[in-house]
Amino acid sequence: MANILRKVIENDKGELRKLEKIAKKVESYADQMASLSDRDLQGKTLEFKERYQKGETLEQLLPEAFAVVREAAKRVLGLFPYRVQIMGGIVLHNGDVPEMRTGEGKTLTATMPVYLNAIAGEGVHVITVNEYLSTRDATEMGEVYSWLGLSVGINLAAKSPAEKREAYNCDITYSTNSEVGFDYLRDNMVVRQEDMVQRPLNFALVDEVDSVLIDEARTPLIVSGAVSSETNQLYIRADMFVKTLTSVDYVIDVPTKTIGLSDSGIDKAESYFNLSNLYDIENVALTHFIDNALRANYIMLLDIDYVVSEDGEILIVDQFTGRTMEGRRFSDGLHQAIEAKEGVRIQEESKTSASITYQNMFRMYKKLAGMTGTAKTEEEEFREVYNMRIIPIPTNRPIARIDHTDLLYPTLESKFRAVVEDVKTRHAKGQPILVGTVAVETSDLISRKLVEAGIPHEVLNAKNHFKEAQIIMNAGQRGAVTIATNMAGRGTDIKLGEGVRELGGLCVIGTERHESRRIDNQLRGRSGRQGDPGESQFYLSLEDDLMRRFGSDRIKAFLDRMKLDEEDTVIKSGMLGRQVESAQKRVEGNNYDTRKQVLQYDDVMREQREIIYANRRDVITANRDLGPEIKAMIKRTIDRAVDAHARSNRKDAIDAIVTFARTSLVPEEFISAKELRGLKDDQIKEKLYQRALAIYDQQLSKLRDQEAIIEFQKVLILMIVDNKWTEHIDALDQLRNAVGLRGYAQNNPVVEYQAEGFKMFQDMIGAIEFDVTRTMMKAQIHEQERERASQRATTAAPQNIQSQQSANTDDLPKVERNEACPCGSGKKFKNCHGRKSFS
């Protein structure tokens, strides 16, 4: 172990020596750049662009370009990047993560690689965790870029598509991680190229990269549409039922946060809903409502997992940042169950139209880099998932903060008493204090205790985060007491007020350890910026969530030996700190394994999504007749239909093929069983294809010109692709839930998901081609519909096509439920084109 550690340290030192060598070269240009006039310095941007176009690489331009930005920052902002900031900038340009401590000027560091990469003209995205930081950084650092002749855009959620397009077309675009993801998804749902807003994804520089790529890695971005539902009463009834239960009626597994009915609970459910057997197949939907109601009432906690806004909306609380997640909803009906629990209006369920995780979103960039003060603990994940190294950058000045040993108390009450006493003592001498909490509930509790103690303070949590920057800016003033959840104003420096250094600087008090060491380090890092004095102290109790769930037997045995008889007894031990860190490592390992599994599942979706989106983009950007593509679909549809009946009795096969042709290809008089008898399968395929081509040409002749033909072809394909893709996403979600249960049968759920997901994808492609064929052949095309089709900006179908499709389903021959579908998919009729009829 010691050898591995020594090797890691040596590698880091070797990397720093390389960085320092390049940084010195950048510094060697300082005098030359300082001697240039403003106009000459600004003219360097055009010079770099020309040199890049002539073949110089960005790496060759780096020393000079970085030196230009340093000088520009000095003239425009009065700030001159230090050597360690240059080193951080080089790491960012290389597509890695420089770990830079709080207050070391990460925002200024980013200006150098952002400028250099913007020279290529392909766009640079600077990603932040909220719109306040995007706007602040774009305004402040944008002055430097604009002065140097580069365009800067801010992409905000409230902007129109035209404004977003303008922002993305700038050399440098500031945006939040979620908005970039949603714009990508929306771009892949439009019908016309001019409605897309993004350019191809080139270089992303992610601020607080650990928050975005690790903490939120499992969070999918979902674009969904409302599904009309009459199930609100079921949510309410299920909620009323679970509220009648006592603790013996359900079983909670604390580590996994799962819950289920006990035998007595099942008996009560059967009595309440008047059922003979709750788990009969026809009660599957009801059990889903009950499961969600149980989770909502006994697992999901108000002010910890969610808050209720003033206008009665349930807002999810991000467990890592403490912020509310605007616009996000718990999936699979859980959000509606919480709404029923809290007695607020139950919003409609929604159906997913498109989704992507941050992991796969950011892996699509040609180059990805990020900044944070705390990433070394997640080094393996950054390397394996994102191919990014973590390079710790030395501080410009030595760290002067004192990190005290953790203090452990027997109970929560005794711990909080000690916290309040410590705050009171420090506040009396004027030392500023930042009290960090894991949950909104805890911050409210400590706030009440400080009010009782007569100590004035500010509270920063998910309920009032709009005042975040102002509260954090004042947190370093003499006598300031600030209570903050994990959000703790990341991205905003706490600067010490006058006379505070003499009092020991800012004291950070942690009220419990987080599951992640990184979050604890972030809280500590609020103090001691740029060599300032400071202190940190964590208070723990045996009743803390982490200690209850993951505290080891060694801790318990150690505490038994200490014989904690008095409630206010405190333990201060280095061994305790090591045990807590060991528990945190176990949790981090579990969380990493979970994220890795999510990625394995999502990679199946990613591959399929990339195929669909690439084909979609090809259709949208096409300025050509899409006839060859549609004819190929018609040919494959005919081939599948004929092959599906190859092993049937010959007479039955011919009858089935004729039925398929009449319902999906040609008018009834165009084909008969008589003319197909005696022909081989290949001959039948060719005959049907030639008849279909005649109808195809006849259909297109109704359109007024080539432009109308191309527009009609585009809308036809996109309408069907989007409809089938949405259904496919839903089916994959259901498959994922189903294969999860197979792990109990010793099957690998991921392997099964990959195999079945691939087959479902192939089936979907076949269904798309069948529907394109049938709609092309059967659509009733009218002049006014053509004009309306050309005005469409979404994937909604022209009305005549949509209604004709419905009519075609109704016109299908009378096929028994369990017979093969005449479309040739190989599925039973009830599971294919007969599904709507039977639903």
Swiss-Prot record:
GO biological process, one term: protein targeting
SUPFAM superfamilies attached to this UniProt entry: Helical scaffold and wing domains of SecA (SSF81886), P-loop containing nucleoside triphosphate hydrolases (SSF52540), Pre-protein crosslinking domain of SecA (SSF81767)
Binding-site list for Zn(2+): 821, 823, 832-833
Principal subcellular localisation of the protein: membrane
Superkingdom: Bacteria
GO molecular function ontology, one term from the record: metal ion binding
Cofactor(s), names only, from the UniProt record: Zn(2+)
UniProt feature, compositional bias: Basic residues: 827-839
Basic and acidic residues: bias regions: 780-790
Function comment: Part of the Sec protein translocase complex. Interacts with the SecYEG preprotein conducting channel. Has a central role in coupling the hydrolysis of ATP to the transfer of proteins into and across the cell membrane, serving as an ATP-driven molecular motor driving the stepwise translocation of polypeptide chains across the membrane.
NCBIfam families: PRK09200.1, secA
Name of this chain's protein: Protein translocase subunit SecA
